[in-house]
Amino acid sequence: MKSLQIYLFLFLSVFALGACIQNDIPYPYIKGEITAFEVEGQTGDAEINKNSRTIAVEVGDEVDIEELRITRFVVNEEATYSVDEQYCVSPNKFPSAGFSALADLPAGADTRVDFSKTVPVLLRTYQDYQWMITVRQTIERVVEVENQALPA
């Protein structure tokens, strides 16, 4: 009886130690990068800085930056992304995978975002990468006055 208890104790000890094996296989390192970005009314190319994870875009004065449609958002193949819901016009219709053109998106997708402030975008692979997108709107107005006496 005593030998049965010893064998049972040894068996349970080995089983308990075996259950403590740690999974130390690391996740692959896949960098989350945005490779192309465009919005409606964009003037020039987007400035994508992969080191600081920032994007700067300039748009003309004819667009509403509070409901600006993203027309191209290309990320590396393994990545998904999310834009903070407070910036999306329709958060439940915003895509989570990159696209080269609006035609690539399913019907009903809405890519409009409020860019009146810098917008954070979280790219996810096996790691998370925080990107910041800034849209600058150039508003240029020229006023001409007839019969002006002195140069302005």
PLM segments and residue spans:
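C-terminal motif of bacterial Sec signal peptides marking the signal peptidase cleavage site
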Residues: 15-19
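Bacterial N-terminal signal peptides that target proteins for export
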Residues: 1-8
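Beta-rich interaction/scaffold domains
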Residues: 20-152
